[in-house]
Amino acid sequence: MINILELESSLGFGGQEHRTQRVINGLDKSKFKVFYGLNPGSKSLEKQIECEFVEFNLKKSFNIFEILKICKFVKQNNIKIISTHSGKDGTIGAIVGKICGVSVVRTRHLQLPITSPLPYNLSTKVVGVCDSVCADLIKRGVKKEKVLKIYTGIDTQKYTPEFKINMKKEFGLNDDVVGICIVAVLRAAKNHKLLIDAFSELNLEKSALFIVGDGPQNKNLHEYIKDKKNIFMLGNRTDVSDFLGSLDICVLPSEMEAIGGALLEASSCKLATIGSDVGGLGEAVSNGKSGFLFENGNKEELKKVLERLILDENLRKHMGEFGRKYVKEIFSIEKMIENTQNLYMELAK
């Protein structure tokens, strides 16, 4: 049995915490036992995760008393691998690993520049969630031989073309209306306003835009769309997989993005996708096959590809079909679990 200690200092439950949940739940329980070290009050404590939760104080990168406490836990529980994800826990995990002589896997989920390569280079292996993230890590000083890509996996059995909720019908729209969506936290970097402007300026009949998510830009965006037609804000939804298949196009116009899991989930539901050409979105969207990429911030280019997909039903269907195959082949949750288990088995030798 290989005992693993996951550490996560983040209190929220976003994309990277979803990935960690999928990995933990997918690991072969006859080979791996997982302890999940979290801050008190972490939202992950409320989730269905097949592990043993442990509360640590991970609010500071260097707290000698907490580091010694974690070292004691590692030795008492025969931990073979420490897995870290965020800035503070990444530094703590790297230090504990060196003190205890335990392998450390640091996963980088974000496209944002790292502040220092040191905690990464102190780790045994550094996992990037896409080629773009891996390349940026190496560019910023992380040793190339430590870096390994493991794509974020999508649950293709959960995200399917079938749907329980018809979102068009929910808003009194006919089935021939082309449903466009963006599924993202409402923050400025996601560039919602660019999509809203592009959609509104096209002003095409039989099309509607659904904005799914919540966040700091909620009030601003409600105000921004109040005089615009056929734009609906759904707020935060926990049932996205139940209605995504009832829509037709998914757009992510982010200024910065790692892998863009929302686009992969949409492709798994056979939606055509559109993404800005930043970070790992060029990997999430197979340009010209599962959807289109457009130049970051270029509204006219976004309008062009959006109009093309709204007006061409056959193209949408063709791209949706290709997209699901593409996700199942490259971004399946099974492949992510397999690659992660292989890494852990190698490090535990």
Predicted regions, residues:
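A conserved, positively charged/aromatic
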Residues: 98-131
